[in-house]
Amino acid sequence: MIYQIINNRKKEILFFVLLLIIFYRSPYILLHGRFMAEEGSRYFANAYKYGFYYSFFFVDFSSGYLNLWANISGIIANIFTLKLAPLISNYLALVPKLLIFYFILYKDSYLIDKFQYKLLLCLLILLSPFNVPEIWLNSINSQIFFCILSFLVVFNKNEKKDINYLNLLIILIAGFTGVYTCILLPIFFFKYLKFKTLQDKYNLIILLFCAISQFIIIVFAKTTNLLYEGKLHIIDINLIYNYIYNVPVKAFLGRNLSQFIFYNLNINVQFAFFLICILSLLIAAYLIYYFKKNQNIFDRNKFIFNSLLYSFFSISLLILIGGVGDYVGGRYAALPSFYLITLALFLAIITNNLNLKIFLHLILFISILSGAYEFKNNNKYKKYLICIDCPNWSSEVEKFNKNSHYNIKIWPYPKKTMKLN
């Protein structure tokens, strides 16, 4: 009883600390609000101009998928006054992040059970370099955090006949908020085959329905030439170089540290690519050797291990062929980086080899430290986090109230505006 009270108190303190870190990164956004790009110019503008039904079922065919949470955020924000609308949208974007921390800390999971690793995973999600300013507190990129949340949901320990309706709602919203979560469908399928609980069955059915719906939207957008022409392209060597830098390198070293190493050692792209490939092959070979030697460890954990590998490679393939142009950094690199970091954490948990455990903990702490350094003021894109000569929202609303044809200035400024007439 006393142990349980102490354990709960630790979780409450950690949750509060995470909230403080979130507020530290962007106090201006959380106190004043801001619309980021299409969050305002498309999704909120739809709700403002066309009402509930149009906004709820709106599909941006140029992107090729339904983004339900962005639609819902625009609708709810429109219920409030125009001065409060961006603030409401920002707090709605915070919802999946808080749910992620709640599930990590308070839910029984096959993925992580000990408090110290729950703490480490929370810090990795919040502070590591993949949590770039581009995806911070805006509804259009909440799909990334809903995918992470869905991945946590699938590894919940479920009773045979109990149903958690919150989990079903999360899967439904996540599945209709972009295509990332739909990629996890095979994991939901094999989780059901493995445990055969009622919860896993309904999770699978809901995500299957979402995946089919999103697939139909993608096919329709592509066949009718509504899909942005830069999407669904072939993979070339320059894209691979870009991917290697933005995912495995930056996930652990961050932008500043990786560029410091490359520039000071005068390493060219081709040589860096060669070194990373060799290092990856050595790590893979060692893991194969280790698991063959410790078959019982692999057998106990192969479902989670294979799920992490599948998620990493499938999401990586998706961003490589579905990203815009020859760039897979920023928001595109977030999920592959998350799965790679989580794989490293999971291996650190299950291995009994001291040298491997030390190495994995070291690269995870480097990821946290490099991400913490870039978390706010040392970030190249800090204008996405803090107000630096940003438009005053109250003044923008007053200008719009005087002239309904005025284009309201939103973030990223000064190039983005929002039309509400």
How does the language model describe each region?
Residues 2-127, 161-162, 190-191, 203-204, ...:
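Intrinsically disordered, polar/acidic, low-complexity terminal segments
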Residues 24, 80, 127, 142, ...:
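Transmembrane helix irregularities
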Residues 96, 103-107, 115-158, 176-177, ...:
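Membrane-interface micro-motifs in multi-pass membrane enzymes
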Residues 123-130, 175-176, 209-219, 310-321, ...:
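Aromatic-anchored segments of alpha-helical transmembrane domains
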Residues 152, 164-190:
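Membrane-interface alpha helices of multi-pass inner-membrane proteins
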Residues 153-157, 184-192, 282-287, 337-353:
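Transmembrane alpha-helices and membrane-interface helical segments
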Residues 183-209:
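Perimembrane helix-loop-helix junctions
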Residues 291-325:
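Acidic, Mg2+-coordinating catalytic modules of nucleic-acid enzymes
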